[in-house]
UniProtKB/Swiss-Prot annotation:
Record family assignment: Belongs to the TRAFAC class TrmE-Era-EngA-EngB-Septin-like GTPase superfamily. AIG1/Toc34/Toc159-like paraseptin GTPase family. TOC159 subfamily.
EC numbers on record: 3.6.5.-
Location within or outside the cell: Plastid, Chloroplast outer membrane
Residue segments, region Disordered: 1-206, 219-292, 315-431, 769-800, 833-869
Annotated Gene Ontology cellular component terms: chloroplast outer membrane
Keyword RNA-binding: no
Organism: Physcomitrium patens (Spreading-leaved earth moss)
Protein's name according to its UniProt entry: Translocase of chloroplast 126, chloroplastic
Ranges annotated as biased composition (Acidic residues): 131-142, 271-280, 335-357, 773-796
């Protein structure tokens, strides 16, 4: 403890030796060369973040006095808010090395570099490893001149350091015995033989050197470089040059080990006193900047370095003939033997220079070291310029920072290390996904190479803004899809792809690339569409005329440009007048039909630079294009402005307008019109300028040059090729649904609404019947048949005489009640008798019709009319249509009255009951017709058209039934209905047959065509009657379309009353299930209706698996008029909500 107490007096002379760069050579001595001195330990040092008393080595008193003279007696503690650069300068100027033993409690969540050794993910790079100081935050600092750098490097190479660690882990995580060993290896300890125990066991010697790294890397004037000749943190590579300053001395290994153990105990005691939370919080605030090792960010141990004058008492610990310590700064981590084995393997890989996957992978130590998000943004994200994210600037910046030799060495060693790591991972966890990712990455790299070859052939630079954006988007798409792994750097991919592209172009300049582009040309008439095509191919391929439209049909122009097959679809010119939009629609219809054969990759919309329409005069034309092709056409469009050499007009002040301003105004005008018709104000279509006049200025190569100096043809083709390249990458990475063959402009075909179509498929439909079967029983008559009873209850009743009103007044109250009950019973029995007679009559008519069909006799239509009294011969008024309640005094029912005439076509108006127009609420009309085909097949046609101010709805249905045996009927139908803005065409067929007397089964198929997509499905339904009162219907089906599937089914159980349909008592329980995209929807509903006296009560309730439901009760009566008062409840509730604000959220729902 005496030695530790002496250390307390060593923490107050920190800044006395800051300017030792110009001092005597005594201040440049290394730790290993300092003579033995006494050691003092004391209390907590304010300069130490962890609160440990640092171990300080002092120089001679003469040197201390000389330094004190230069400093003027100023004393300041290191770590009191100064920057890492200042700490490094102080370290360079220091004549001593003052170091703290590593704390046994490293930082939480990760292993400290000094307490636990170097992180597992850091690779030992052998003799050429560098450790850089990454100071991105100080980009604005001006580097010192060469002399200052040399001085700094010289100072830092002989500098000493103090290492300390913060106490931030819990006491449970500490292992003092193990930590003692790690601390012994982490610090430069003397050994009588000059070799550590580890080096004796391994039979090798690992040496490291810490010195100032003065490189060309920006923002790194004070960086650190890890060499191969050092003995630890405190040793220096220039000790030999300054050896004459001090006498050779040897550190006593046992004394150093004892000091280490004692310091550890002090650290544990301080940690127990201060607590974990406060300590860790303080350390987080004092964390300095970062160290970057081969683009890998780790925590900087800057707070462990201090500079203090040497205490003479510490010289007693030094031997006069101490040898340099050769203890290596080894990596210490969990699984020590495994780490050493991995280090050996990595060293072998570095020596052999093997690369993994042609240099694609690289150890991503940034993630292993746990770099923060802000650091990732400052280190990885490319700069955002006016043209968007630029990858080239990032590549140039990173390449310029590292010397060529350093980059080559680091790349080789990183690839070798990553090869070892990836191989080990594959052996442990083999996965097919790795192979798929590598294959996808290779294909994407081929796309990059192809694009760069196109760029070289067009004479463009890889630093072009368009090229940079394409490469950036390819990298971004790859990372989003998972193709970019953590061992993969975009800079390396670009360099490799660019080198391959240049090599292939140098060997095969005339080779035809596996690349083709189809371009659709649209625009006004006379703007120069065909002339531009001729200019691109440098030959006359399209007919042009300066005075009349030359292109009257849609046709293809195919040619080869720079080894690339380019196909243009030339179209007739469009007229921009509102009255000519019909003409434009016909042309667009022909174009749409033509491009179904081959979908274009890009659309060029042409307009003239010198013809500007005001106040959105082109909107009608652009809207016609949008209505025909959809809004997706504008997301793949490049705006081309011809006659680009036109002189700019005069400005508002009478002076000629600048050319760039004129181009910007004209481009903005066209882009704004496109945004308006596309409905997306964020849309920004690229603009390309074109000049086809023979007198256009040209360069030495004969290429036409615009007034702004741009060669327009390579620029236009680069935009087209870039769009096609991005489309290929999208197809490869499957970022979104690709367009179906023949679908124009890469539009995403919408998936049909399968749940809606499946619900329509599962719906039961009634079978059509012949006219002579209309009076026959309904489809469910067999289920409703009742056995004839042996007697008629109504006939067995005694005689009954009705009482007059005067006689009822003479009866008492009880007698009047008994009379009403008797009258109700007789009325019910009479209705039952009539229902039974009706069923018997239907049976007889069914038997007679069956007998007549067997004998081959037909039932004349006029005979049926005679039996029915010929009701169709005389027009009769149809019942009045039920109108919604209104506060108008006039009842406009007469407006909707119509007659049923002898005509077979039935036409009726359609009233919108919820419309705003009460007096004239016609919303559409309905048409129906029933007829028979060849006297055997009943058929029906019905349609309805509705139209309001915004949209129209069309519904059409045609159906026919065909009997092919007893109890077997097939129903076919064709439906047309509006879904959104498209028409859905459905063809359906189903067959019903009787399995048993009380069981019917139905099987059906359907096919729907919607939006260029076909959805097909099947269904199966079974009906069964249990007794006379219970009926069950079970159905299920599946519908598929465009690779998507939907499953559904329903169960319905009906319980009828004993006297149904006379009593109208009915209860229904339903359950429906729908599965689409893995989303299971389950719903249940219950409905019951019954009579309470003369009041009909109807109750409904439904609930689904998402917890939403509804309950409703309805009562209708002609006697209990007081039920109208129930309507006051919602009115009072609304008034209360408005007055007091209660239930506002619920009422809004």
């Amino acid at each position: 403890m005496d030695a530790l107490r002496k250390l307390s007096s060593l923490g107050r002379n920190q800044d006395k030796i800051l300017d030792t760069a110009s001092s005597s050579s005594y201040t440049e001595a290394s730790v290993a060369e300092i003579p033995k001195a006494s050691v003092e330990t004391g209390g907590k040092d304010e300069a130490s973040p962890s609160g440990l008393a640092p171990i300080k080595v002092r120089v001679s008193n003469d040197v201390g006095a000389e330094i004190e003279e230069k400093r003027g007696g100023d004393e300041e503690s290191v770590g009191s808010g100064e920057s890492f650069d200042s700490a490094l300068e102080r370290l360079a100027a220091s004549s001593v090395t003052s170091f703290e033993p590593p704390s046994p409690v490293g930082s939480v969540g990760e292993q400290s570099q000094f307490a636990g050794g170097v992180s597992e993910d850091l690779e030992e790079r052998g003799q050429e490893e560098y450790l850089y100081y990454d100071d991105y935050g100080d980009d604005g600092e001006v580097e010192k001149d060469g002399s200052e750098k040399d001085s700094t490097s010289s100072s830092s190479s002989s500098s000493s350091s103090e290492c300390s660690s913060s106490a931030s882990n819990t006491e449970d995580e500490m292992d003092i015995s193990e930590y003692g060993a790690s601390s012994e290896r982490a610090m430069p300890l003397a050994n009588p033989s000059g070799v550590t125990d580890e080096e004796e066991e391994d039979g090798k010697e690992l040496k490291y050197n810490v010195e100032r790294a003065v490189t060309a890397e920006e923002n790194m004037p004070n960086g650190l470089k890890l060499g191969s000749e050092a003995r630890g943190i405190a040793s220096s590579s220039r000790g030999a040059e300054l050896g004459n300053a001090f006498k050779d001395s040897r550190e006593d290994h046992e004394v150093q080990e004892e000091l280490t153990e004692r310091s550890v105990k002090v650290a544990v005691e301080n940690y127990d006193q201060e607590g974990e939370d406060a300590d860790s919080t303080e350390i987080k605030k004092e964390f300095p900047r970062e160290l970057t090792q081969s683009r890998t960010v780790i925590e900087s141990p800057a707070y462990r370095f201090t500079s203090e004058p040497v205490d003479p008492a510490l010289l007693e610990l030094k031997s006069e003939k101490a040898q340099p310590n050769t203890q290596s700064f080894a990596r210490i981590a969990e699984g020590e033997s495994d780490a050493d084995a991995d280090a050996d393997a990595d060293d072998e890989d570095v020596e052999s220079g093997d690369e993994h996957e042609d240099g694609y992978t690289e150890i991503n130590i940034r993630q292993a070291a746990g770099k923060s998000e802000s650091e990732n943004e400052s280190g990885n994200n490319p700069s955002l310029g006016p043209a968007g994210p630029s990858l080239i600037s990032v590549l140039v910046r990173k390449t310029a920072r590292r010397p060529a030799s350093t980059a080559a060495t680091d790349t080789q060693s990183s690839n070798a290390a990553s090869s070892t790591q990836v191989a080990g991972t594959t052996d442990v966890n083999p996965s097919i996904e790795v192979n798929e990712v590598n294959e996808t990455r290779e294909k994407l790299q081929n796309i990059r190479v192809k694009f760069l070859r196109l760029v070289h052939r067009l004479g463009q630079s890889p630093q072009n803004v368009v090229v940079a954006q394409v490469l950036y988007r390819l990298g971004l798409a790859e990372s989003l899809r998972g193709g970019s792994t953590r061992n993969h750097t975009r800079a390396f991919d670009f360099d490799r792809a660019n080198a391959i592209a240049e090599e292939q172009e140098a060997d095969n300049q005339e080779e035809e690339l596996d690349f083709a582009c189809t371009i659709l040309v649209l625009g006004k008439t006379g703007v120069g569409k065909s002339a531009t095509i001729n200019s691109i191919f440098d030959e006359h391929k399209s007919v042009t005329n300066a005075y009349n439209p030359s292109t009257t049909n849609v046709y293809e122009v195919v040619g080869t440009m720079l080894g690339v097959k380019v196909r243009f679809v030339d179209t007739p010119g469009l007229l921009f007048s509102v009255a000519d939009q019909r003409h434009n629609e016909r042309i667009m219809g022909r174009v749409k039909k033509y491009i179904k054969k081959a979908s274009p990759d890009i659309v060029l919309y042409f307009d003239r630079m010198d013809m500007q329409t005001r106040e959105f005069g082109d909107v009608p034309l652009l809207r016609t294009i949008t209505n025909v092709f959809g809004t997706a056409v504008w997301f793949n469009t490049i705006v081309v402005l011809t006659h680009a050499s036109t002189a700019p007009p005069d400005g508002p002040n009478g002076t000629p307008m600048g050319y760039e301003l004129f181009v910007a105004q004209r481009s903005h005008s066209v882009q704004q019109s496109i945004r308006q018709v596309a409905g997306d104000m964020r849309l920004q279509n690229p603009v390309s300028l074109v000049e086809n006049h023979p007198a256009c200025r040209a360069n030495r190569n004969g290429q036409r040059v615009l007034p702004n100096g741009q060669i327009w043809k390579p620029h236009l083709m680069l935009l087209c090729f870039a769009s096609k390249i991005l489309a290929e990458a999208n197809t490869l990475l499957k970022l979104q649904d690709t367009a179906a063959p023949g679908r124009p402009f890469g539009q995403r075909s919408r998936v049909p609404p399968l749940p809606f179509l499946l619900s329509s498929l599962l719906q039961s439909r009634a079978q059509l019947k012949l006219p002579d079967e209309q009076l026959d029983e309904s489809d469910e008559s067999d289920d409703d048949e009742e056995d004839e009873e042996e007697g008629d209850e109504y006939d067995d009743l005694p005689p009954f005489r009705s009482l007059s009103k005067e006689e009822l007044e003479e009866l008492s109250k009880d007698q009047r009640q008994e009379y009403a009950e008797e009258l109700a019973v007789r009325e019910r029995l009479f209705q039952k008798k009539q229902h039974r007679e009706q069923l018997q009559r239907r049976k007889e008519m069914k038997k007679r019709a069956t007998a007549m069909r067997k004998e081959g006799l037909s039932h004349p239509a006029d005979e049926a009319d005679d039996e029915a009294g010929q009701p169709a011969a005389v027009p009769v008024p149809m019942p009045d249509m039920a109108l919604p309640p209104s506060f108008d005094s006039d009842n406009p029912t007469h407006r909707y009255r119509y007659l049923e005439t002898a005509n077979q076509w039935l036409v009726r108006p359609v009233l919108e009951t919820h419309g705003w127009d009460h007096d004239a609420g016609y919303d559409g009309f309905n048409v129906e017709k029933m007829f028979v085909v060849k006297n055997k097949i009943p058929a029906s046609i019905s349609g309805q058209v509705t139209k309001d101010k915004k949209e129209s709805q069309v519904n059409f249905e045609a159906a026919a039934s065909l009997k092919h045996g007893e109890g077997k009927v097939t129903l076919t139908g064709f439906d047309v209905q509006t879904i959104g803005k498209d028409l859905a065409y459905t063809l359906r067929a189903e067959t019903r047959f009787n399995n048993f007397k009380r069981n019917k089964t139905t099987a059906g198929v359907t096919a729907t065509y919607l939006n260029d997509t076909i959805a097909a499905g099947v269904k199966l339904e079974d009906r069964i009657l249990i007794g006379k009162r219970v009926k069950m219907v079970v159905n299920g089906g599946v519908l598929t379309g465009k690779g998507d599937k939907a499953f559904g089914g329903s169960l319905e159980a009906t319980l009828r009353g004993k006297e149904y349909p006379l009593s109208r008592t009915l209860s229904t329980l339903g359950l429906s299930v729908m599965d689409w995209h893995g989303d299971l929807a389950i719903g249940g509903n219950l409905q019951s209706q019954f009579m309470v006296g003369k009041t009909m009560m109807v109750g409904r309730a439904n609930l689904n698996n998402r917890g939403s439901g509804q309950v409703s009760i309805r009562a209708s009566s002609s006697e209990q008029l007081q039920m109208v008062l129930i309507g006051i409840v919602p009115i009072l509730r609304s008034l209360i909500n408005c007055r007091f604000g209660f239930g506002g959220g619920q009422s809004s729902q």
